[in-house]
Regions:
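Alpha-helical, largely C-terminal catalytic domains
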Residues: 1-149
């Protein structure tokens, strides 16, 4: 999506580079993990089961412990790996002799992924979908369903 909306391509040797894979994976997994925390209460009320919080609870952890485990995973693994990968890019570029135009595209790609993570996080903290007053009966439409009604 980033490449399409930015109207550029990354060369395969850049797109598949370990650092870019780490950055891309963070852009996918961090929002999913955060969503698991924010949506757990609503999904529990509805009887949904596809949430990592519930999987962790099945291992004998409390809900609060599951939240903490996920937060630690995000901070200690994903954010740390993302920061490390971004920090490695200049050396990686120098070693490959990457041209300035490609470096600019990679910078845009990385910044867009980071903005996506931040924007999704902000939306999750502000949307009414995750507020307790929006946790309505499982037999009635909720936030997502109301978008399609």
């Amino acid at each position: 999506m980033v490449k399409r909306t930015g109207h550029f391509e990354l060369p395969p040797e850049i797109y598949h580079a370990p650092q870019i894979r780490v950055i891309r994976r963070a852009g996918i997994d961090i929002p999913i993990l955060c969503n698991s925390i924010y949506s757990a209460e609503r999904e529990a009320l509805r009887g949904d089961v596809d949430n990592i919080v519930f999987s962790i609870e099945q291992e004998g952890r409390s809900r609060e412990q599951a939240f903490g485990d996920i937060c630690h995973l995000i901070d200690d693994d994903y954010v740390a790996s993302l920061s490390r990968a971004v920090g490695e890019l200049p050396h990686f570029f120098d070693a490959l002799g990457v041209h300035l135009e490609i470096r600019k595209n990679v910078d845009l790609y990385v910044r867009t992924i980071c903005f996506w993570i931040a924007g999704f996080q902000q939306w999750q903290t502000e949307t009414v979908c995750y507020r307790s007053e929006s946790n309505i009966s499982p037999d009635k439409p909720n936030c997502i369903e109301s978008l399609f009604a």
